[in-house]
Each structure stands twice: as C-alpha cells, then as structure tokens.
C-alpha cells in the first residue's frame, strides 16, 4: 500500500506562496532531487501542476542540478486533479471526477510514497483522511503576506 505524503514549503511567518519563496538553497534542492527520484508518483492540484510544468522545459540557463531535477520529475507518473484542465503533459493523468476514489485506488494498488502538491488539494485529501504523513519545509524568509 502506498503512503500519501504532503510536503509543504513555507516561510518563517507561515505563508506558502511558492513564487515569492524563490528557489531553495542548494542543499535543500539536492534533497528534493533525491526525494523525487525515490517516489512512486506525484499528485497535484491544478495550480501546483501549472507551476511544476516548468520542469517539462529544457532551458539553456539550467545548471546540472536543474537538469537532474527535471529528469527525475519527468520520469515520475503524475496525477493531476482538476475540473478545468482539458489536458495534461507527458507522463501525467488528468483526474477530473471522483478524485477521492481514484486516490484511494492508487494507495491500494501501489507501493512506496506518493507526494501531494497543492494546498487546496491537500486540504480536501486531509478532510477525507487520505494523507498519511506531513512534511514541513521551513524556508528562511519572511513574506509578510500571502496564502497562510
């Protein structure tokens, strides 16, 4: 049975605006590369998936670690929970209806860890009792506002 893990990066004052947090420090980024390499898959809400689609690109200014993360991310199966998206990118499956049922099935059929990305989706999954573990990553910044 797979374990559903919600990982959340937040500022020291408790906000989760990923665009304002900026990139992680190199040590943390290396951790995330290894984390993604070891996953069974990723489940995203629409907004977080749209942010993470960045890694489907191949940008000339990327360094070796950026490329390593992109390769790891692209290799993992992804499930995207959205009623508004009509399609998703490579190695991704759109989940438009009855996402709780789909996620319960994934947990039952797969082994390892499935990472959840997106605050709105995580709240729904938590209310349904589907998240098995929470991981909080504190970023050494104070944002002063945003999504708590």
What are these regions (language model features)?
Residues 1-148:
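Enzymes that bind and transform nitrogen-containing heteroaromatic metabolites
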